[in-house]
C-alpha cells in the first residue's frame, strides 16, 4: 500500500464535499488500473492524504503528486527555489506572513515572509495588518514564495513573494474588474450558487488559483459586494474576500 500526503488541503464548512471531489477524481484515475482507493482523509493541517493499494499504486501516487502537488520533507527544501503554498495564520503575528509549503515532518517549518521584505516588495511602509488589508493577503490564498534562508537546526525558513505572485497582485490592482475570492469550495458549487442566484452572467471569468481556491472576476458593471451578498448565504462558512482595485489603491496610497 502507498500513502501520499498532497499539498492540496480540504478545509472549512465543506471539507467532506471537497474530499468527495478528490475521491471522485482519483476513482476516475484508477478505473482502468490495478489500484484501489484504501482511504482519503486529512492530516492536522488539513492536507489531503490518499492511500492506494494495488500493482499500479506507484504510478497512481506519482500521478496524484503531479496533479495536486506532493508534501515535502524539511531536508528537501532548497534555498533560492520557488515553492507553492498557502498563506496561514494571517494577522496572528505582526512580524510577517507565513506560507504553508506542505512540510510534513515539522510543525514549525512554514515559510516566514518577514515584514521588512514585504514592505520592500510591495513598496509600502505600513504595519502588517494594514498591508494585509490593502493587498487582500488572507488565509488560504495560494502564493508562490522563493526561499531565502533555511535553518534546519532551529526549524526556521524565511522567504519572499515570488515574482509570479507579485505580478498577479499587480495585475489585479491595475484591472478595472472587481473580484470576489472564494476559498474552500469546488467549482461546481460556485457555478451552482451563481446560477441559483441568477448571477452567473455577471461573472466575466472564474479563475482557479488552487484546487479549491477561486477568483470570480466580475463584469465591469458588476460589484463584487453584490455577488458576495447573493452567494454568501448559499455557501455558508466558505471564506470569501472582496478584491476591489479602486478601494485597495486608496488604502495603499493612504499608507505609503
Model-based region annotation:
Residues 47-148:
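S1/OB-fold single-stranded RNA-binding interface
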Amino acid at each position: 500500500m502507498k500513502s501520499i500526503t498532497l499539498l492540496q488541503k480540504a478545509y472549512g464548512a465543506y471539507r467532506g464535499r471537497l474530499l468527495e471531489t478528490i475521491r471522485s477524481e482519483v476513482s476516475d484515475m484508477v478505473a482502468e488500473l490495478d489500484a484501489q482507493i484504501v482511504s482519503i482523509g486529512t492530516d492536522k493541517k488539513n492536507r489531503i492524504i490518499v492511500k492506494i493499494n494495488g500493482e499500479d499504486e506507484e504510478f497512481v501516487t506519482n500521478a496524484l503528486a503531479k496533479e495536486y502537488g506532493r508534501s515535502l520533507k524539511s531536508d528537501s527544501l532548497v534555498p533560492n527555489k520557488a515553492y507553492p503554498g498557502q498563506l496561514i495564520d494571517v494577522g496572528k503575528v505582526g512580524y510577517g506572513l507565513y506560507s504553508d509549503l506542505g512540510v510534513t515532518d515539522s510543525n514549525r517549518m512554514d515559510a516566514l515572509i518577514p515584514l521588512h521584505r514585504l514592505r520592500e516588495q510591495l513598496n509600502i511602509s505600513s504595519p502588517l495588518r494594514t498591508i494585509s488589508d490593502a493587498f487582500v493577503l488572507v488565509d488560504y490564498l495560494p502564493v508562490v514564495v522563493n526561499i531565502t534562508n533555511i535553518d534546519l537546526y532551529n526549524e526556521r525558513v524565511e522567504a519572499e513573494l515570488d515574482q509570479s505572485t507579485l505580478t498577479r497582485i499587480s495585475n489585479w490592482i491595475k484591472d478595472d474588474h472587481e473580484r470576489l475570492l472564494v476559498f474552500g469550495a469546488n467549482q461546481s458549487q460556485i457555478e451552482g450558487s451563481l446560477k441559483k442566484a441568477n448571477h452567473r452572467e455577471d461573472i466575466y471569468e472564474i479563475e482557479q488559483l488552487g484546487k479549491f481556491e477561486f477568483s470570480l472576476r466580475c463584469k465591469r458593471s458588476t460589484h463584487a459586494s453584490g455577488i458576495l451578498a447573493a452567494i454568501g448565504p448559499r455557501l455558508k462558512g466558505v471564506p470569501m474576500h472582496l478584491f476591489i482595485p479602486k478601494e485597495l489603491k486608496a488604502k495603499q496610497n493612504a499608507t505609503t
